């Protein structure tokens, strides 16, 4: 639900912004969304004793130095309609939209053994050429017996399981005999 509402706000922001200002606004919202990881901040935002104007002033003080009237007006609008809690969703929708526009994505490689950086680069380049985009991959050590590549924004997940490959090889050998 939050994502649908965030997309509406994104559409409005995109109409009045160019690509460079979109990146800067996305950065501002990304930083604001990090504040929602702080329990004390969430207590203040969810506290019914704190007025909408006070919540708005707290957020406006955080973004005042950026000097974007659009951001300030959006924060006032969000506070007015009690939608401050969707700021992280707006930040995520903006990040995905910018990635889609620039065709630059990030993904994760999961494996139980260390994957060489050259292999990671080759995987990223191969996937990037397949999807006509630039994909950067980072490694996460996991208990997955094989290699799994996940590029969430593209909706791509590729996995190579050692057990499955062994099973397929055995089946192929049995068929050959």
Swiss-Prot record:
Q: Which GO terms describe its molecular function?
A: proton-transporting ATP synthase activity, rotational mechanism
Q: Which compartments does it reside in?
A: Cell inner membrane
Do you know which Pfam families this protein is assigned to?
Answer: OSCP (PF00213)
The record's family statement is: Belongs to the ATPase delta chain family.
A single Gene Ontology CC term:
plasma membrane
- State the protein's name: ATP synthase subunit delta
Q: What is its main location?
A: membrane
Source species of the chain: Sulfurimonas denitrificans (strain ATCC 33889 / DSM 1251) (Thiomicrospira denitrificans (strain ATCC 33889 / DSM 1251))
Name the HAMAP family on file.
ATP_synth_delta_bact
The source's superkingdom equals: Bacteria
Q: What does this protein do?
A: F(1)F(0) ATP synthase produces ATP from ADP in the presence of a proton or sodium gradient. F-type ATPases consist of two structural domains, F(1) containing the extramembraneous catalytic core and F(0) containing the membrane proton channel, linked together by a central stalk and a peripheral stalk. During catalysis, ATP synthesis in the catalytic domain of F(1) is coupled via a rotary mechanism of the central stalk subunits to proton translocation.
How this chain sits in the membrane, per its record, is:
Peripheral membrane protein
- Quaternary structure and interacting proteins, as annotated: F-type ATPases have 2 components, F(1) - the catalytic core - and F(0) - the membrane proton channel. F(1) has five subunits: alpha(3), beta(3), gamma(1), delta(1), epsilon(1). F(0) has three main subunits: a(1), b(2) and c(10-14). The alpha and beta chains form an alternating ring which encloses part of the gamma chain. F(1) is attached to F(0) by a central stalk formed by the gamma and epsilon chains, while a peripheral stalk is formed by the delta and b chains.
Kindly state which keywords UniProt assigns to this record, in alphabetical order. Answer: ATP synthesis, Cell inner membrane, Cell membrane, CF(1), Hydrogen ion transport, Ion transport, Membrane, Transport
Q: Does the keyword Secreted apply?
A: no
């Amino acid at each position: 639900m939050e994502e649908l509402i965030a997309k509406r706000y994104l559409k409005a922001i995109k109409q009045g912004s160019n690509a460079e200002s979109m990146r800067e606004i996305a950065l501002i919202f990304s930083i604001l969304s990090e504040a929602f990881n702080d329990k004390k901040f969430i207590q203040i935002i969810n506290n019914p004793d704190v007025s909408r104007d006070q919540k708005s002033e707290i957020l406006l003080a955080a973004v005042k130095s950026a000097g974007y009237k659009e951001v300030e007006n959006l924060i006032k609008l969000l506070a007015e309609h009690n939608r401050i809690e969707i700021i992280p969703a707006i930040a995520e929708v903006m990040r995905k939209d910018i990635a889609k526009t620039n065709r630059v994505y990030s993904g994760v490689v999961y494996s139980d053994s260390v994957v060489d950086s050259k292999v990671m680069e080759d995987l990223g380049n191969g996937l990037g050429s397949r999807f006509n985009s630039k994909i950067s991959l980072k490694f996460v050590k996991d208990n997955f017996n094989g290699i799994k590549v996940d590029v969430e924004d593209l909706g791509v997940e590729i996995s190579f399981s050692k057990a499955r490959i062994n099973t397929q090889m055995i089946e192929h050998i049995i068929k050959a005999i």
